[in-house]
Amino acid sequence: KKPGLVVHEDDDNTPDTLIHRILHYLYNKGEYRPEEENSFVPALCNRIDRNTGGIVIAAKNAAALRILNQKIKDRELSKKYLCLVHGVLQPKAATLKDYLVKDGEQNRVRVFHQPVPNGKTIITSYKTLKTNGQISLLEVDLKTGRTHQIRAHLAFYGHPLVGDTKYGTNAMNKGNTHRYQALYAYKLRFDFSTDAGILSYLNGKEFTVDHVSFADEI
């Protein structure tokens, strides 16, 4: 999906959503018949933020949804992200482990080095692909999948995403031309260690978005 598109209806009852587009597409192909009694409604298996672009998985039938949800839970699918951050990370590649707490009132999360009440462990691996000394392009692998994890975790270490007004600073974003934070779920791989039934044909397959616009800015 493109940045700016919500995956599901939100509190504003946004009519244009990713799932609505998917249902419309499948209806036109004759693969979704809402008028039929007990018809399965295709559903999303994962979500990404409104302002994040990238690969999202949808299931067209109940069996696929059940299998994919279990595979995601068992971490038999891997997703990688590209992002632009302020500054140069040292070391160039590392795995960060900290704790995250959701702040519902502020619609944001907070990160801590030590365990805190209601805190959940977050693990984020990153690798610097290139840098110009002021901004860096990273490939990020989430070992845990928490709300705003990449954005908040990297900002916690002093390297917020370019264009991120929630976790960045006004000074860093001065002169920014990005409408959304520079974050994209660009790679998905299926590595099944157990039987996947009707989806076994996906095992070992990898899907990659060939061109992410902000990756060319360095």
Regions picked out by a protein language model, each given a short descriptive name:
Residues 1-104, 117, 215-217:
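RNA pseudouridine synthases
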Residues 53, 133-134:
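Beta-strand-connecting loop/turn residues
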Residues 86, 140-143:
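A structural micro-motif recognizing beta-strand termini
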Residues 107-109, 136:
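Hydrophobic residues embedded in beta-strands of well-ordered beta-sheets
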Residues 116-123, 128-133, 143, 147, ...:
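Pseudouridine synthases involved in rRNA/tRNA modification
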